Curated annotation (Swiss-Prot):
Lineage: Eukaryota, Viridiplantae, Streptophyta, Embryophyta, Tracheophyta
Transit sequence range: 1-24
Example GO biological process: glycine catabolic process
Provenance organism: Arabidopsis thaliana
GO MF terms held by the record: aminomethyltransferase activity; mRNA binding; transaminase activity
Protein name from the UniProt record: Aminomethyltransferase, mitochondrial
Self-association state and partner proteins as the record states: The glycine cleavage system is composed of four proteins: P, T, L and H.
Record gene name: GDCST
Amino acid sequence: MRGGSLWQLGQSITRRLAQSDKKVVSRRYFASEADLKKTALYDFHVAHGGKMVPFAGWSMPIQYKDSIMDSTVNCRENGSLFDVAHMCGLSLKGKDCVPFLETLVVADVAGLAPGTGSLTVFTNEKGGAIDDSVITKVTDEHIYLVVNAGCRDKDLAHIEEHMKAFKSKGGDVSWHIHDERSLLALQGPLAAPVLQHLTKEDLSKLYFGNFQILDINGSTCFLTRTGYTGEDGFEISVPDEHAVDLAKAILEKSEGKVRLTGLGARDSLRLEAGLCLYGNDMEQHISPVEAGLTWAIGKRRRAEGGFLGADVILQQLKDGPTIRRVGFFSSGPPARSHSEVHDESGNKIGEITSGGFSPNLKKNIAMGYVKSGQHKTGTKVKILVRGKPYEGSITKMPFVATKYYKPT
């Protein structure tokens, strides 16, 4: 596909992200063009042809000169460099930082070895998801975590409220929000070999989910082997004043194969990887069990509870949820958020939460929720797009096999 079809695809994704952003902003805070925050790489994006759009109160590149489709494919074939500094990195410190965090998330934080991490979910009293987050135990008295841009204000207020209560009972915990640092995501098969050129540390011993503080390109960085694409890769927390130099060095060392990539391709990549987007696929009324994130609930936490909404979540683990997140293949136009899912008799059984055309599979994919009992792989469904039903089927996720770097 070339020319007009690709342009239409890009415009469709652009509109979808912009509409999603408007929904998020209207719920959480309003920002005019003049109020939009800019990352340390803003001028760098503009100089490289970045198309800047409002996203969660920030001016962020949705794409560059490459089409969204080409950028998505290039990430899986070579590599992509994303600016994700709109997300919020923070550190919790103190001898009680681990038990404090365990009151708010479902992960077995105490069971993590220093230098390792995991995806987790912040929950509310009803068992719903406040946000998902990648957390890392740097040491037994230092936790580093990253929360979503659109949830920043809500998450920080939530953490602060519970921290005050925890400290009032004698708990030793403090926090620091890393507003002085940028966050870059280097993803794809060339991520490790390119980054290895910029550090003396042996990255072959740093596996998926591992964390290290090290020198990269002459700057002290927080490096986590993780990402939002399903590919091998890294998230690099770098001081703001060194962010542009690091981005330039990564692009130069790749000899043009790793390309700057925007939010449009990032959305396609995470959808292909079957990963949730908070605000679409996860919300405050959806539990980790319903979202298919049971694996993120630590075994010890299932036995002991101790986090907000534990009674609801542990009951769902016992009885099973009433709805389940599943993947879909569909015919016709790509299904979008809020498209209804019907069974073959025309009864509504669920709803799409994310969908689009997969540049790597060359077919429509989507994820959403259906009633338990209707979630089996291979189940035939009808997906309504602009009121018209199209053939679809339920499938397992991820749609594209993940390539996380793990010990053999």
